[in-house]
């Protein structure tokens, strides 16, 4: 096989340019292999294999014909059930099925197969080809995977060339290479019998992204097993119910779910499976934990419909990762069809309430700040007072800085220069300490939250916190929490804390 042929190499390079390689940095390795490849034997004289058609003393080299085995897989079931026999597999048959050469009457006459059978095989091939995604280890980049592309471009027309190659690392056991001599190999059947297929699969997926070696360990398996059992138990108690009027925490959790769907979908499409799985198992759990805390603080018992809707989306996305437990949970949720047949949840930007996400983040960060102050001061609180910004100029400066930072600038000098250049914020030069703190505040936020703030209107922080802190604040800290605007006339501010309030960063007094 003359892999050194420059025209053949160039065709392969064109294929690599057009196909998706994950991770993308491995593309250069493929092209380097194509550059140095040269002649390679297509046959050998020892071992098992298929006899070379024109010389029975030789056996076809496995890395020559086997690299297009997926073409054979499209028709293997017809071989296995006896529909196709060796004597039927003539050159004319393969020319018609794989290469679209000749016509069906010639294939029928030479193969002795009925037109119906040949149509059935061709339909199967056309359904599965081209190869959507080929997954393998990095050690095969220098041989099998490169030959896979070279042989496909040599044999098949362009529309049947491979579309994607995904390269992954190896699987380690507790940080060490698996080997019989080290005694650190767990037979697959034993592992599945002891723990089930789903925990084993998820433990491997969750241990590494593409190209990284997956460090398999039993502690991870036990943890995931417990997580799946917990999800099963949780969903067993949920019933589909009509969702009534939404409260603040409802709008937040439904909006967060839309965001999670978008994140997980993107991760799966880009083969960042570890990231997608982490979001399904843990990010959702974190969101639901906060939601449960909010609901319990208000004494609500009318959220089964919302929890059912959210966990239905979660389990549908879990299904490709852990199909067995997903089907069990899906049934517990009341569905009669299989989870694997359900539609992948669709992201809808219209269903994201940006204000609810921002306001809930404000509530969470305020609670966290109170907790941190109590930890540091060791105070047993008798009174908690929150001061929110109500200075219009400070708000205007904040919005201006926000826009500058979302635009990619975060240098203090650049920010100050742009503030001074704007007639509406030019007086900001008198408050450098405030500007520095706002920049620090925004640095700590995700790009998603900052973008939401830019796109949405301001909301009344005082009104929101006054309403929502009443329940969760009392439950968390055992005292009533007062909320003032920093410029309120009737403000209680014995220590002058109010002047430190910034948008989305209230000042706090604890007595």
Question: What are these language model-derived features?
Answer:
Residues 244-265, 278-282, 289-368:
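Acidic, turn-prone loop/beta-hairpin segments
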Residues 49, 199, 326, 337-338, ...:
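Secondary-structure boundary/capping signal
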Residues 218, 222, 337-511:
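C-terminal low-complexity, glycine/proline- and small-hydrophobic-enriched intrinsically disordered tails
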Residues 1-3, 220-235, 315-332, 483-510:
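Structured, non-catalytic alpha/beta "coupling" segments that mediate domain-domain communication
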Residues 23, 90, 114, 217, ...:
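Helix N-terminus capping/helix-initiation residues
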Residues 1-241, 257-294, 309-318:
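Structured secondary-structure scaffolds
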Residues 156-157, 195, 322, 333-334, ...:
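A broad structural signal for alpha-helix termini and local helix breaks/kinks
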């Amino acid at each position: 096989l003359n892999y050194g042929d420059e025209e053949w190499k160039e065709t392969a390079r064109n294929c690599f340019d057009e196909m998706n390689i994950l991770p993308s940095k491995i593309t250069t390795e493929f092209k380097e292999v194509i550059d140095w490849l040269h002649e390679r034997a297509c046959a050998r004289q020892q071992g098992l294999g298929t006899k070379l058609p024109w010389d029975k003393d030789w056996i076809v080299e496995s890395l020559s014909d086997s690299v297009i085995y997926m073409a054979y897989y499209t028709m293997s079931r017809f071989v296995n059930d006896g529909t196709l026999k060796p004597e039927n597999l003539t050159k004319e048959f393969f020319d018609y099925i794989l290469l679209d050469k000749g016509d069906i009457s010639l294939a029928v006459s030479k193969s002795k197969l009925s037109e119906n059978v040949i149509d059935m095989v061709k339909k199967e091939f056309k359904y599965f080809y081209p190869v959507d995604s080929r997954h393998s280890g990095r050690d095969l980049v220098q041989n099998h995977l490169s030959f896979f592309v070279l042989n496909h471009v040599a044999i098949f027309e362009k529309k049947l060339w491979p579309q994607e190659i995904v390269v992954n690392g190896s699987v380690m056991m507790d940080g060490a290479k698996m080997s019989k001599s080290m005694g650190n190999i767990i037979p697959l059947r034993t592992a599945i019998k002891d723990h089930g297929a789903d925990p084993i699969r998820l433990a491997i997926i969750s241990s590494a992204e593409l190209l990284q070696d997956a460090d398999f360990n039993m502690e991870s398996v036990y943890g995931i097993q417990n997580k799946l059992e917990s999800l099963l138990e949780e969903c067993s108690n949920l019933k589909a119910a009509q969702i009534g009027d939404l409260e603040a925490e409802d709008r937040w959790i439904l909006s967060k779910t839309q965001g999670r769907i978008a994140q997980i979908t993107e991760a799966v499409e880009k083969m960042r499976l570890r990231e997608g799985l982490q979001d399904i198992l843990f990010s959702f759990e974190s969101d639901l934990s906060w939601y449960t805390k909010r609901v319990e603080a208000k004494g609500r018992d009318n959220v089964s419909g919302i929890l059912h809707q959210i966990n239905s989306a979660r389990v549908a996305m879990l299904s490709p990762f852990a199909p067995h437990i997903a089907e069990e949970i899906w049934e517990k949720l009341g569905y009669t069809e299989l989870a694997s047949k359900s539609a992948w949840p669709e992201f809808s930007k219209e269903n994201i309430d940006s204000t609810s996400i921002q306001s809930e983040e404000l509530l969470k960060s305020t609670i966290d700040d109170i907790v941190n102050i109590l930890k540091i001061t060791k105070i047993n609180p008798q009174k908690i007072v929150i001061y929110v910004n109500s200075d219009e100029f400070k708000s205007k400066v904040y919005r201006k800085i926000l826009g500058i930072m979302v635009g990619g600038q975060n240098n203090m000098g650049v920010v100050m220069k742009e503030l001074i250049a704007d007639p509406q914020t030019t007086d900001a030069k008198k408050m450098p300490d405030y500007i520095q703190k706002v920049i620090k505040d925004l640095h700590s936020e995700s790009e998603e939250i900052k973008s939401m703030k830019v796109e949405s209107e301001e909301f009344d922080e005082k009104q929101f916190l006054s309403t929502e802190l009443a329940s969760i604040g009392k439950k968390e800290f055992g005292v009533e929490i007062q909320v003032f605007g920093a410029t309120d006339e009737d403000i209680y501010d014995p220590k002058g804390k109010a002047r430190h309030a910034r948008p989305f960063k209230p000042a706090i007094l604890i007595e």
